[in-house]
Amino acid sequence: EKPISRNIFFHESKKDLSNISSNDVFGLDGLLSKSFESYELRSNQVEFSEYVEEIMCNEGGIGVVEAGTGLGKSMAYLFGSIKYSHSHSTDNPVILSCYTKHLQDQLFTNDLPTLSKAIDAPIKAVLIKGRNNYLCKTRFNWLVNSSEKILSGDEAMNLLPVLVWLEHTTTGDLDECPGFTNGFTYRLIGLIHSEQGFCTSSMCAKNDGCFFGPLRKIAYQASLIVVNHALLISDAQSKINGGESLGFLPESNAVIIDEAHNLPKAAYHQLTITFENKSVNYILDRIDPRHSHSVRWNSSLRSIAAIHPKFEISRSALEGLVENARHTVKMFFDKMTSNSLHQFDEKSAEPIKTDLSVHCP
């Protein structure tokens, strides 16, 4: 049976790491050798770990190092990070960034427990992914309660794995539930994952709550935070834009970027904004009073209209505005497609001129 994933790792100890060197850990008869039956000394691993420790101990230090496969670099920089956080326990945490969520999970669930057991060091570590990876229990329960109005029969069936998984998960990480995420559940995921606008409000907290919020609070108490490149970039972008209460993550004292050569690629994908017909119409579905996807939204509008009758006029006008928006969006993408097909034909390519504005009475 596969164990349920964990995203919080605490190891209590009063052991002093200040006099423990990289060779004491990774040497032939070092602390780590006791964790493996056939331990092999890798001198490059010792050098790598010493280099990481040296860079981290120099304020403002920046280091770049290339390591071949099989060197054991994860363990090497983990020890440097743990030792540094131990000697700077009152400072900000160390952030470890991996290229993919798979490598992030491997570092946290395999390497970190093995090393912490070997060196018996005090550790408070948290694994955290982007907000959209986590289930919001409030949104999920509301969806289940309104499923007959909002979901098709197949969509309701696709939620069954989540209902079973929810009884066991301690993380709320939807990647733990492949029976759900491996299906064609794009719309469903959008309806149940943690959402910045809703899950940062009191409405979510007063009901069933969200997995991401409490985890984010725990991250501010951790000495090590394991993230992926996408979240690291999102956090920097959020702090620049002033969103998410000035970032997802606390200010760090040091950052280690594993597979840093993939950082530009991750930045490109993370910072790319995709504008497509399907996504625009999905948004319009959620505010269209006539569409089944807007049941909760439409119910709220009717409640307001019951108190303020004039609001009903605006609600009725919304149908026409949404229809106009759909037509305009279709014209826009049809023209974009035409221009793309004839992009090298100067006579065929024309500027797109259409009025995207709408007016509410």
Language-model segments: which ranges?
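A substrate-engagement module of RecA-like helicase motors
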Residues: 2-35, 88-225, 229-230, 285-319, ...
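Conserved pre-motif I regulatory segment
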Residues: 15-65
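Walker A/P-loop NTP-binding motif
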Residues: 53-55, 74-89, 110-114
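Walker A/P-loop
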Residues: 58-79
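Residues immediately C-terminal
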Residues: 103, 232, 262-265
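Conserved helix/coil segment N-terminal to the catalytic DExD/H
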Residues: 213-220, 230-249
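SF2 helicase catalytic motif II
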Residues: 248-281
